[in-house]
Amino acid sequence: MFSRNYNASQSQRDLKSQLEEINRQKQKITIDSQHFEKIKSVTKNVNELQNMEKRVMKSRQNFLNYGIDNF
């Protein structure tokens, strides 16, 4: 019986850590997107814009893949 409670407790911790990771990733994507939009309006350097856009898109893709793999 104790092991069941432990497993349930462990499961809740795992869920909590997953939710925390999701929130961290969402926050990172939001910050990267906002940063990209600010840089986009200021810079004329095409290479820098392309690199930033790739980084933002990669973050978004990683987040989507995480959701697909875990839910």
Swiss-Prot record:
Q: Which domain of life is it from?
A: Viruses
Q: Which Pfam families match?
A: DUF919
Q: What is this protein called?
A: Uncharacterized 8.6 kDa protein in IAP1-SOD intergenic region
**Organism expressing this protein natively:** Autographa californica nuclear polyhedrosis virus (AcMNPV)
Q: Lineage of the native species?
A: Viruses, Viruses incertae sedis, Naldaviricetes, Lefavirales, Baculoviridae
